[in-house]
Regions:
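Sec/Tat signal peptide C-region and signal peptidase I cleavage site
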Residues: 16-21
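Short aromatic-glycine-enriched beta-strand elements
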Residues: 76-80
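Bacterial N-terminal signal peptides that target proteins for export
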Residues: 1-8
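SH3/SH3-like (including bacterial SH3b) beta-barrel domains
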Residues: 51-64, 70
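Bacterial N-terminal signal peptides
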Residues: 9-15
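Boundary regions of SH3-family modules and the immediately adjacent low-complexity/disordered segments
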Residues: 22-35, 83-117
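Extracytoplasmic/periplasm-facing segments of secreted or lipoprotein envelope proteins
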Residues: 34-56
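A structural signal for short, hydrophobic beta-strand segments that form beta-sheets
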Residues: 26-41, 67-73
Length: 117
């Protein structure tokens, strides 16, 4: 009984990180950046936002150094990005939840939800 309980506990503990990592919906992401020659943040490389989750969809360059929330995931590493509240405004939620488009998750770093603003 103790062996089976220990085995079950170990299995559950080992499966938790995999289950958490399998779905990024609701996570906060920020574009990957580096410090430029003038000391300001710059994108590591151009980040494109697409109208649909495929590489042939119309695209535009991301220009905002801002955090986003992942609304949905699609095959190929695409995530749908939505805006987060802007606490510099009188009504922070007025700009939250607007769909930006689809982007590659590999172009973003995860950020703690408490810092997602």
């Amino acid at each position: 009984m103790k062996k089976s309980l220990a085995a079950l506990s170990a299995t559950l503990v080992l499966s938790l990180p995999a289950a958490h990592a399998a779905n990024n919906v609701g996570q906060c992401v920020y574009p990957k950046t580096k410090v430029g020659a003038n000391g300001n943040l710059v994108f590591r490389h151009p980040i494109y936002v697409l109208d649909a989750p495929n590489a042939t969809a119309p695209k535009r360059a991301l220009t905002a150094f801002a955090a986003f929330t992942v609304k949905a995931e699609a095959p190929g590493g695409f995530v749908q990005l939505v805006t987060v509240p802007n606490y510099d405004l009188p009504n922070p939620d007025s700009v939250a939840g607007k769909v930006i488009g689809w982007a590659k998750l590999s172009d973003f770093d995860f950020q703690e939800l408490r810092n997602c603003n």
